[in-house]
């Protein structure tokens, strides 16, 4: 899903949404857009939600869901002339979450120190995207993008403390031009700086990953697109980067698109990818257990080849169009940072891949309007994700083998009513290897089904809606291991593979002033 914020020039002058649920969640968001003149416009986005009602339906003294309070806002500006366009903005976030045991779940029985988890995060980021058309006849243009962010996150997992402060600066200079009708060239320069400052008491022995980490990456790239006719497009690119941590590396890629007929589109791609892993910021959820964390060696940059093919069918059926999309993606890791929870049920080991690690994902979806206003969509995704854990090739734990989706949507002829229903099927998978002498969980987890539905009534400028989530009321039984003794070596709250809350009902109101 590709999500983009509304552009100030295109957004409605005012949109407001308020929402409440049976789980005690209250949320409100608003968007206001202002067109100051023909060239300059701005928009303000605000969101706040509060979900601080305690839930402990299974009576294990641990909250089924964190108590949460969050505020975020963004101010976005848009400036445009016939040859120049600029988009800039600032975003802020303040997020507070509390989980574990609280006075509500202990019911006043606080004879021992409660196991409380808290996470406070504050974030600010700014960005600016600027483009200048040099020659409209050749679609020749130059663009400059710059962004920066600061993230402050302070966490407590009972007696464990983990605080991380992240800073990022990114800049990119891009050039594009067409050479005739068949050839297009794009080239550019990139710079990225990441800095992590970490404080706490969560690692068993020293590792370079625990110190303050800073990485500078400078890169250059070129991309050539060949379109000999309306049916065929070939794009090939190469980039080279220099990292202050990993030195030089090159990243090639190629994409092919072929419109075989008016109803069949084919695509194929191949390329290489690299990624620097920051173990603790990316895996802080592991601290919600008594597992000890070990980094066994200096961790290398992750490296993988990626391949993909896809086909889209648009078939006329009884004066309507049946749309079918099928795609397959395969990732083959040359190196990967492995998080091994199988070697020891009381520890997590991080090390470089020594063996094979692959991911094969196949997805197919189809949609068809059965009759006026009624659309049916079905989708199925199969995932085969394997890695080498301590010399053994196994499927990735806590990962479903498949997911399936069936949605039905009906809108009345006058568009006053809309009814939506979604059924989601989640396949089972493998659990981390339990303790053979004292197994506290099974080796696999089962498949499960969830149902959600919503009805909307529209009026001229406002609408009301109501619905429910997880209407099948499926819940994972006792997701917290050894909840009765959270300071024991067996305690583990990360073995979560399904929903921990039952059904939720909700209702809301939307109001908007449309753009004239």
Identify the residue ranges that each predicted region occupies.
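Transmembrane beta-strands of outer-membrane beta-barrel pores
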Residues: 18-22, 48-52, 79-83, 92-96, ...
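N-terminal periplasmic accessory domains that precede
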Residues: 1-17, 30-31
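Gram-negative outer-membrane beta-barrel transporters
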Residues: 229-230, 329-332, 352-434, 510-515
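Membrane-embedded beta-barrel scaffold of Gram-negative outer-membrane proteins
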Residues: 141-147, 151-155, 259, 265-267, ...
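Outer-membrane beta-barrel transmembrane domain signature of Gram-negative proteins
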Residues: 113-134, 142, 148-235, 353-354, ...
């Amino acid at each position: 899903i590709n999500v983009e914020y509304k552009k100030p020039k295109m957004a409605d002058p005012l949109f407001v949404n308020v929402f409440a649920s049976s789980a005690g969640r209250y949320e409100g968001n608003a968007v206001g857009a202002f067109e100051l003149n023909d060239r300059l416009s701005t928009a303000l986005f605000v969101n706040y939600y509060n979900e601080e009602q305690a839930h402990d339906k299974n009576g294990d003294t641990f909250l089924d869901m964190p108590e949460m309070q969050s505020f975020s806002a963004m101010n976005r500006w848009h400036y445009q002339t016939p040859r120049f366009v600029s988009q800039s903005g600032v975003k802020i976030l303040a997020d507070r979450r509390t989980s574990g045991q609280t006075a509500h779940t202990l019911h006043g029985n606080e004879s021992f120190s409660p196991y409380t988890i808290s996470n406070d995060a504050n974030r600010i980021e700014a960005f600016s995207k600027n483009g200048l058309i040099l020659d409209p006849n050749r679609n020749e243009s130059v663009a400059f993008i710059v962004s920066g962010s600061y993230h402050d996150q302070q966490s407590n997992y009972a007696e464990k403390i983990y605080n991380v402060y992240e800073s990022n600066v990114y800049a990119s200079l891009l050039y594009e031009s067409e050479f005739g009708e068949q050839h297009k060239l794009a080239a550019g320069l990139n710079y990225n700086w990441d800095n992590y400052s970490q404080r706490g008491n969560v690692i068993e022995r020293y590792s370079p990953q625990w110190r303050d980490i800073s990485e500078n990456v400078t890169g250059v790239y070129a991309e050539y697109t060949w379109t000999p006719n309306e049916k065929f497009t070939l794009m090939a690119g190469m980039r080279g980067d220099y990292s202050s941590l990993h030195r030089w590396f090159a990243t090639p890629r190629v994409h092919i698109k072929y419109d075989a007929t008016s109803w069949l589109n084919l695509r194929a791609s191949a390329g290489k990818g690299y990624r620097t892993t920051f173990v603790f910021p990316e895996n802080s959820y592991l601290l919600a257990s008594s597992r000890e964390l070990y980094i066994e060696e200096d961790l290398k940059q992750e490296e993988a080849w990626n391949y993909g093919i896809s086909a889209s069918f648009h078939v006329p059926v009884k004066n309507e169009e049946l749309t079918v999309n099928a795609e397959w993606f395969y990732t083959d890791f040359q190196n990967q940072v492995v998080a091994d929870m199988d070697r020891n049920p009381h520890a997590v080991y991080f090390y470089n891949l020594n063996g094979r690690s692959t991911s094969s994902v196949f997805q197919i979806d189809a949609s068809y309007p059965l009759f006026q206003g009624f659309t049916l969509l079905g989708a199925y995704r199969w995932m085969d994700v394997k890695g080498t854990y301590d010399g053994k090739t196994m499927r990735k734990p806590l990962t479903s083998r498949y997911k399936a989706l069936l949605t039905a949507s009906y809108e009345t002829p006058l568009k006053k009513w809309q009814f939506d229903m979604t059924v989601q099927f989640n396949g089972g998978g493998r659990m981390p290897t339990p303790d053979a002498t004292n197994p506290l969980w099974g080796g696999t987890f089962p498949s499960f089904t969830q149902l959600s539905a919503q009805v909307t009534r529209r009026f001229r400028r406002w609408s009301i809606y109501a619905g429910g989530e997880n209407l099948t009321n499926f819940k994972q039984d006792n997701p917290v291991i050894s909840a009765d003794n959270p300071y024991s070596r067996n305690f583990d709250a990360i073995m979560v593979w399904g929903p921990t809350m039952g059904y939720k009902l909700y209702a809301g109101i939307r109001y908007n002033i449309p753009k004239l």
